[in-house]
Amino acid sequence: MCIRDSLWVASSDYTVDVRAGKNIFKQLSEAYRKMRNTARFMLGNIGDFNPATDMVAEDQLFEIDRWALKSCNSLTANVRAAYDNYDFSRAYHAIYNFCVIDMSNFYMDVIKDRLYCADEHARRCAQTALYRILVDFTKLVAPILCFTAQEIWSYIPKLEGMQEYVCWERMPEAKSDEDAAFDAKWAKIIAVRDDVKKVLEQARADKTIGSSLEAAVTLYCNDEMYDFLNAIPMDELADLMIVSHVDLVKGEGGVRGLTEGLGMSVAHAAGNKCLRCWKFDTAVGEDGLCPRCAKVLG
């Protein structure tokens, strides 16, 4: 109740009449759960992460990890500006959208497989990004969710110099990280992913597949789109789409989406389902594991 009320105050635009009601409080309770669950996912996946010894340098991170850090940096800039102008509603909505759109619906969904199945370096890259994002996120949310922020902070592994209480920490500073080419590249990747998601939803409706990991996606590309997507390792592209397999084909075909020069088709992936990662692979063994998961389990 207290948390819901504090979110109601923070989310309200005090320059106009403030509304209150059961539906509004219900929506805020759901928003709080989304923000809390975002933090819980990050905490749950850095349990074995020691920031003093396991942190990976930013230039060695996967591109999607750097994208997530840039997204968090943009959040920092927006929230700091909102707090400086006492615009708590703007800060709240920026934090909420970051949790739902950037983290839950995209980044955290994509890296789950890497956190559970990848080699040590790939996993540490994802953990590094999660750790850095969680530290900044907790500081940013503290002014409007002080008790939740302190609860999160108490579980975060501390580097030397970090305070016991989050309210004693300085707010994170937004860095100057303008990279138009990087931003344009990832905007294009996300647009392709959004188109593929729509085709996957139709394939589910047609009973071609159940979950997206049952899918093998063929992307029909013009020359420019082929070169763009072919520069991304196919296993990373499959992870971005959350499917078992991706093929690139030059030429027209499949269902057209909003992305220029791209057509898509979906079929059921070949092979059997790995009992650990749930991806379909023709090399799944008698133990029900794909070679990658068998290697992880030793």
Feature map (PLM): residue ranges:
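Core structural elements
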Residues: 30-43, 63-75, 93-113
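Short cysteine-rich clusters marking metal-coordination/redox-active sites
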Residues: 274, 290-293
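Cys/His-rich microdomains that often coordinate metals
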Residues: 281-284, 294-297
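Acidic, turn-prone loop/beta-hairpin segments
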Residues: 49-77, 109-199, 203-227, 247-250, ...
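Short helix-adjacent coil turns
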Residues: 83-90
